[in-house]
Amino acid sequence: MNPSAIVSNRHTRARESTLRQIARIGPFLEGSLSPFKRLGCTQPGWHLTFKQHGRTHTLYVPMELVAEVKQWTLNYRRLKALIRQVTRHSRALIHRQVANRRAANHSKALMSR
């Protein structure tokens, strides 16, 4: 289906708006940042936990990068939510196109009788 065949409606506008938000997200990183206790230290250490090829891995995060890595993981969660929104609006556009085509075919069939 070419883009010109899609009539602009609320789903098209919402999808375009969400795509613009995705473009502004910035750096992202999949995983969870978790503190762990270090012997003899009052401050916790930090690990990034993530899945790779079906296995869980952890990566030590130096203290000077913790704030930045937290932001990256938050950006990743936000990105996933935005992708779900784009998907929902794209499915709605497909559903609307199919419904419009069925209605047009139905009215043609009634007119030809």
Go through each PLM region and give its residues.
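A positively charged, amphipathic N-terminal helix/segment that binds anionic biomolecules
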Residues: 1-113
